[in-house]
Amino acid sequence: MQLTLERSGYATLNIDYQSRRGTLETLAENIRPAIELFVSGLSNSVHFVGHSMGGLLARVYLARYRPEQLGRVVMLGTPNGGSEIADRLKNISAYRAFFGPAGQQLGTQRDSAIAALFPPVDYPVGIIAGDRSIDPIASAFLPKPHDGRVSVANTRLDGMADHVVIATAHPWLMRNSLAIEQTIAFLRDGRFRR
């Protein structure tokens, strides 16, 4: 994804964040300096592309620190409506250890504090969902269609500008050539190609 975006003329910042070491609020604070430094060197629109929890992290970040020159946002396999897998596994110690505090915020039933992290979007958001699974165990917990981690229904978001479903599984969304093409189309045109 990053290389193709760069070849298409976009400057990129690929942030490696410690997703298991804090809440979404803490993670938003942690990525803030890198984003602010990157944005300070740009004169044009700043777009965000996030995969899975990265899309939720972008929403939390933008609710708190939205750059003036915000352009468009693309989310790939992001559990905007929560994750049924998180609902089932959140009380299991192995899940808590693997997904950390942010993993506890991924459920479909959100209390008012978690819901407050995700105010309505008022910027252009395009969402790419997958509808294939490579994980038969996770598939048992998810309503169809799904990508093996997130149901297509829970990728949707009130106020989104566009939504597209492609034939791939959750882990491959960021490397799928069609997902990459659709990401660039949305960043450029504000809509996906049909």
Describe the predicted segments one by one.
Residues 21-25, 174-177:
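Soluble non-cytosolic domains of exported or imported proteins
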Residues 2-8, 12-15, 24-122:
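Serine-dependent carboxylesterase/thioesterase catalytic core
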Residues 17-22, 167-171:
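Histidine-bearing beta->alpha loop at or near hydrolase active sites
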Residues 120-194:
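C-terminal catalytic-base region of ester-bond hydrolases, centering on the histidine
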